[in-house]
């Protein structure tokens, strides 16, 4: 098995990249790929850059050029669920766009024409992630809907707008839906796991800057534990 791992930012991939053995670096169209092994698991890590277009292009290159069997999207997110704390980890049950509106033509809010309203994460990967995280010390795990848009959400009015369109939102971020959509189109199983860096409120930018490192460390721990579990499966 080969696992594709996607993080948007340097902080979200550097810990994993530094753990690779037999590492090979490749650059394609300004996207950076890092092949190697985490333990005995063959992986390829993509630093995609921030935002939906970057994520979609990078994921397409990852799948087309490196042929991963599964894809894990990791990194940070803004938390929506009550009781969620910075450093907690969210595992996606499904992923949707929160900034797509073609409802005038009969589509659901968030649905891209010709695509499903939601992209369901692979049930086996969700189960593995949940089980692994529950056994990590000092990390709380949540499951739920992750929504994606090309904006950093730090406004309670925008939070209310998102919650008005979707039930059960666990977290918001900027890359998961196009990654999920690309995996759907290529038929590659995926899961999104995000560590909470902020609460998507008016203090979100300050919280994000302060807690990105914590969120990134927790995400890296989780991904390494998941690849180890998949290696044993």
Curated annotation (Swiss-Prot):
CDD domains: MTAN
Pathway involvement of the protein, from the record: Amino-acid biosynthesis; L-methionine biosynthesis via salvage pathway; S-methyl-5-thio-alpha-D-ribose 1-phosphate from S-methyl-5'-thioadenosine (hydrolase route): step 1/2
Keyword Membrane annotated: no
GO MF annotation terms: adenosylhomocysteine nucleosidase activity; methylthioadenosine nucleosidase activity
Claim: Amino-acid biosynthesis is one of the keywords in the record: yes
Single GO cellular component term: cytosol
Catalytic residues (positions): 12, 198
Catalytic activity of the protein: S-adenosyl-L-homocysteine + H2O = S-(5-deoxy-D-ribos-5-yl)-L-homocysteine + adenine; S-methyl-5'-thioadenosine + H2O = 5-(methylsulfanyl)-D-ribose + adenine; 5'-deoxyadenosine + H2O = 5-deoxy-D-ribose + adenine
InterPro entries per record: MTA_SAH_Nsdase, Nucleoside_phosphorylase_d, Nucleoside_phosphorylase_sf
Gene3D superfamilies registered for this protein in UniProt: Nucleoside phosphorylase domain
Keywords: Amino-acid biosynthesis, Hydrolase, Methionine biosynthesis
Enzyme Commission designation: 3.2.2.9
Swiss-Prot/TrEMBL GO biological process terms: L-methionine salvage from methylthioadenosine; L-methionine salvage from S-adenosylmethionine; nucleoside catabolic process
Top-level EC class as recorded in UniProt: hydrolase
Record: residues binding substrate: 78, 153, 174-175
HAMAP family: Salvage_MtnN
Protein role: Catalyzes the irreversible cleavage of the glycosidic bond in both 5'-methylthioadenosine (MTA) and S-adenosylhomocysteine (SAH/AdoHcy) to adenine and the corresponding thioribose, 5'-methylthioribose and S-ribosylhomocysteine, respectively. Also cleaves 5'-deoxyadenosine, a toxic by-product of radical S-adenosylmethionine (SAM) enzymes, into 5-deoxyribose and adenine.
Sequence similarity: Belongs to the PNP/UDP phosphorylase family. MtnN subfamily.
Name of the molecule in the record: 5'-methylthioadenosine/S-adenosylhomocysteine nucleosidase
């Amino acid at each position: 098995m080969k696992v594709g791992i996607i993080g948007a930012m340097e902080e979200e991939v550097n810990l994993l990249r530094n753990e690779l053995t037999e590492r090979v670096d490749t650059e394609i169209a300004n996207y950076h790929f890092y092949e190697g092994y985490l333990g005995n698991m063959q992986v390829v890590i993509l630093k995609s850059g921030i935002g939906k277009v970057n994520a979609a292009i990078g994921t397409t290159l990852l799948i087309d050029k490196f042929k991963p069997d599964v894809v894990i999207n990791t990194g940070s997110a803004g938390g929506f669920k009550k009781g969620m704390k910075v450093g907690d980890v969210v595992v996606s049950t499904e992923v949707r766009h929160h900034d797509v509106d073609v409802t005038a033509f009969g589509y659901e809010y968030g649905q891209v024409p010709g695509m499903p309203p939601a992209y369901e994460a692979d049930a086996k990967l969700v189960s593995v992630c949940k089980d692994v995280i529950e056994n990590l010390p000092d990390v709380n795990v949540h499951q739920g809907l992750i929504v994606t848009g090309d904006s950093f959400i730090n406004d309670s009015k925008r939070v209310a707008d998102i919650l008005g369109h979707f039930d059960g939102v666990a977290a918001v971020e900027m890359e998961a839906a196009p990654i999920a959509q690309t995996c759907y189109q290529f038929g590659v199983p995926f899961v999104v796991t995000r560590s909470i860096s902020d609460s998507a409120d008016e203090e979100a930018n300050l919280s994000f800057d302060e807690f990105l490192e914590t969120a990134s460390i927790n995400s890296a721990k989780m991904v390494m534990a998941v690849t180890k579990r998949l290696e044993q499966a």
